[in-house]
Amino acid sequence: MRTQEADNVGHGRQIAQTICVACHVVSRGQRVSPNSEAPPFPMIAETPGMTSIALTAALLTSHRLMPNIILEPDERRDVIAYILSLQ
């Protein structure tokens, strides 16, 4: 039986592979970044001190080069769970 956390990570991966992949490397197996200025998810995950709070703030803040992606709170939670699973 799958756990809720595994479901969240799986859903976050699905969102990342659908939306975020337009600019970011979203998995360790992806070699080419569509946008060289968009940090790869594995690099984001491995940033010292990276937490769900820091990722929430980043996703809710406008970035100069990042499109304003609107995620529902549960989608944002799941993308964050996926990113942190890459640690």
Write out the residue ranges for each language-model feature.
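Electrostatic cytochrome c docking/interface patches
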Residues: 1-15
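The canonical Cys-X-X-Cys-His
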Residues: 12, 17-27, 79
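Short, non-ligating residues that shape and space the ligands of small metal-coordination modules
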Residues: 29-30, 50
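A broad, low-specificity signal for short, low-complexity segments enriched in glycine/proline
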Residues: 2-6, 26-29, 40-43
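Extracytoplasmic electron-transfer domains, predominantly the class I c-type cytochrome c fold
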Residues: 36-87
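Short, surface-exposed glycine/acidic/tryptophan-bearing loops
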Residues: 32-34
